Amino acid sequence: VTCSRKTTDKSHSKIARIVVRRAPGKVTQAILQYGPLRLRAALGRSGITSCKREGDGATPRATMRLISAYRRGGRMGALATGLTMRRIRNDMLWCDAPAHPAYNRPVRAPFAASHEKLTRDDRLYDVCIVMDWNITERRRGCGSAIFFHIAREGYAPTEGCVALSPADMRRLLPYLTDRTLLTVL
């Protein structure tokens, strides 16, 4: 199974485009650009890859549409955005078991197969935007739970996601819709 993906973008110019480029000399950090905004971002612990695999810790090199969003109640206050944001509940999980039929899909507890909890003790998923990596065209073992979320202190590496500081996420959110494309170069 090949996990790389060619992206052909024949969309209209009115679609918001975010570009993420590796920061000079830093494998796990990036500069996220949206129009005139240039924001510091965290990447996966293995940097960027063209051949994403489950558990490799890499951020996929791809163009991904922002398809849905979640938020942790109360932590970030009111958020202005063009995305529909659902509040994260205690029973919300994300399946990361490649052999399971619900692979790379949201699921509810109790759930026996390998999964990630969306209610975290840290702030990472205070805002959690699902990017269309391996969702619309799902392939087992090609990576799951590739999100656009809040960064750890010091922009420590993610498990393959793209992450911003809370202030920068709040700054960018008003411009985002379900037509926004995020490109990792």
How should these model regions be labeled?
Residues 161:
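Short cysteine clusters
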